[in-house]
Amino acid sequence: MASPCLVAVLVFLCAIVSCYSDNPIDSCWRGDSNWDQNRMKLADCVVGFGSSTMGGKGGEIYTVTSSEDNPVNPTPGTLRYGATREKALWIIFSQNMNIKLQMPLYVAGYKTIDGRGADVHLGNGGPCLFMRKASHVILHGLHIHGCNTSVLGDVLVSESIGVEPVHAQDGDAITMRNVTNAWIDHNSLSDCSDGLIDVTLGSTGITISNNHFFNHHKVMLLGHDDTYDDDKSMKVTVAFNQFGPNAGQRMPRARYGLVHVANNNYDQWNIYAIGGSSNPTILSEGNSFTAPNESYKKEVTKRIGCETTSACANWVWRSTRDAFTNGAYFVSSGKAEDTNIYNSNEAFKVENGNAAPQLTQNAGVVA
């Protein structure tokens, strides 16, 4: 008969394996103790609408050795130097770093910023990350907090574009404008001046997964404004994230487009959890919603810009296999949408909502 200690160890290991195997992204790489010997395997693990994202896979490893920042003429070894190169790069960090950027950091296409193995903090009172007309970008394993507004100033956008005057920015943690194929995974985001993630101006093919969003009011905006109908082609997957504590609203807030919100865990909200305007399609599947204690805050959803309930009755907002606690409820509308929204490369298994707390227990930066 096995000893009690051995049984306890086996139970513990089985719990870990179960956690990884149920979360398709984590099971793809976290079970390999030698992941640091093949960092680029991470690019094979993305699911959902961003599943084609390559990041810097196939390129060189670039190591950040300095936390210094020069917005116009960055030096080799700094994060800005690597992020603005034209070629594919897999960016890693030589040591723990606190980086306060002087101006927004423009991230060029075919880049992975991989914080695994180091404790990397961005923001710290400065502006943060910006992507414009970029494709194939992966951001993984970063603490992004305290992002602040920036003033008008010159910034190196990329090697090919060069230095441009950049308008003042709002203080978002991550801004994506006209971006295709991007994956934001296992980051911890909080306490910024405006939003934590903005996906706008025709961006599509985006997966936002395994992140921890907390201590912030306006979390995630998908879609530019109600007049920008190019965002009708937007497709975003929001999966395996932990929202809260102290997350106010916009988890996400969508305009136009198609958003699949799957296996996320919501630890209350201040105004609403999922909202939108301009007739977005929102498919909520297998999420766990715990409502605030106030009786007037129980509804998960908020339709914005509808003078009457009938005005947005045809918007397709569906709840499937979600779990509701403390009086939370989801107001569905529209005709049932075809649930086969993914191709074979994008599709992933979605568990019932009562499994979401386990699936998200390792959300955020993994130590």
UniProtKB/Swiss-Prot annotation:
Single GO molecular function: pectate lyase activity
Lineage: Eukaryota, Viridiplantae, Streptophyta, Embryophyta, Tracheophyta
Gene3D superfamilies found in the cross-reference section: Single-stranded right-handed beta-helix, Pectin lyase-like (2.160.20.10)
Residues with glycosylation annotation: N148, N178, N293
Protein's recorded name: Pectate lyase 1
Family: Belongs to the polysaccharide lyase 1 family. Amb a subfamily.
Function: Has pectate lyase activity.
Free-text comment on the cofactor: Binds 1 Ca(2+) ion.
Binding site for Ca(2+): D170, D194, D198
Keywords per UniProt: Allergen, Calcium, Disulfide bond, Glycoprotein, Lyase, Metal-binding, Signal
Keyword Disulfide bond: yes
EC number(s) reported in the record: 4.2.2.2
Catalytic activity: Eliminative cleavage of (1->4)-alpha-D-galacturonan to give oligosaccharides with 4-deoxy-alpha-D-galact-4-enuronosyl groups at their non-reducing ends
The species this protein was found in: Hesperocyparis arizonica
